[in-house]
From Swiss-Prot:
Belongs to the MurCDEF family. This is UDP-N-acetylmuramoylalanine--D-glutamate ligase. ATP binds at G113, T114, N115, G116, K117, T118, T119. Keywords: ATP-binding, Cell cycle, Cell division, Cell shape, Cell wall biogenesis/degradation, Cytoplasm, Ligase, Nucleotide-binding, Peptidoglycan synthesis. Cell wall formation. Catalyzes the addition of glutamate to the nucleotide precursor UDP-N-acetylmuramoyl-L-alanine (UMA). It is found in: Cytoplasm. The lineage of its organism: Bacteria, Bacillati, Cyanobacteriota, Cyanophyceae, Oscillatoriophycideae.
Amino acid sequence: MPKATIIGLGRSGIAAARVLKGDNWEVTLSDRSNSPNLQQTQGQLQQEGITVKLGDSFTLNPEDLPNLIVVSPGVPWDIPVLVEARDQGIDTIGELELAWRYLNGCSWVGITGTNGKTTTTALIAAIFKAAGLNAPACGNIGYAACELALTQQSYDWIIAEISSYQIESSATLSPKIGIWTTFTPDHLERHKTLDNYYQIKASLLSRCRRQIFNGDDPYLHNIGLSQWKDSYWTSVKGKEALLCDPSKGIYLQDNWIVAFGELIAPINLFKMVGEHNQQNLLMAVGAARLADINKDAIAEAMATFSGVPHRLELIRTIAGVDYINDSKATNYDAAQVGLSSVEAPVILIAGGQAKKGDDTEWIKLIKAKVATVLLIGEAASTFAQRLQESDYYAYEIVETMENAVERSASLATDKGVKIVLLSPACASFDQYQSFEHRGDHFRELCLQL
């Protein structure tokens, strides 16, 4: 019986373990944590015949080497034990690659990019569902990919949101349609350089049979003709802005969506705010037309799609003030997009665990649109200093989300502001388990006002 080790006892790791166990592998799950929740999961899995080692930093035992190592998305690909395993010729892959090995009999759409992945993935899944297709979303959204392999259903398509971390560990993953939404500096603490980050993303697209690119993204537009000239391109700026022949373009013209020369639907059917969401929609429409989905299904999904939690999500309106949750804005570019999508003046809640990147354009937009910035988390003092250096002084360090929401309500009344926006420009791990946890807390506090 072949042996497999799974590193990481999260949702992805558990699904991977069950897939392999069901295929007659001897499976061991390893996780450094030893929390009560994991201990409960350990008991459940061990009843299924899966060995679980908690409080365990996986090492290679020369006397008992696994045939396969599967890593969860959060495990760095370059930690010494994984480098050593690959050097020894041990098959070392990510959970998404494992799912691909079991599910490559059906067609995949793979969506990657710095920002916009989740909304684009959700839009594609909604359009494919409206067309009557069995096309679940997975990866960073919806199911863990291996959970789909467990069901043994027959899928028409799989719609996979794929992070750079997952691409690193998925060397043969080759979707039929690949989409690249945006590209800006992010995850450089892991990938070191912008070029490394680009090459990882590009490796996935190069394996896809057809590629769709966001032609309105400055970086992708700049390298487009030199590296991706035979691909499909989108633009919200009209036919003249396309990087390809209009027969391979998806674009807005006179408030209509046009795909490959065909009128699809009027853009006013689509209710999500922001030009960036129109960009996401065009890529989704391109994928749908490449999958031969008709215009009626596209129009139906456009009209009924309400958005994704934590991405410019309207929580409630109190006394004319909109409270908007954009917790997914974990870097400067995403926060800039969020702020540009709402009307001034704004009370902005920002801060958390800072990331590397250029904050210049974000701060310019703050100066133009924000009445007061409320700063929370580890980055509060750093952000305060950056705002001072830019001659912006309308900020307060409030430290916690509870303080921020309470203060935002009084400031909105005092200053006649109609928008309170949580768009942190930071990771969440200083105070929260995830950006979802942070956004859920913001929602809970707003609903208590």
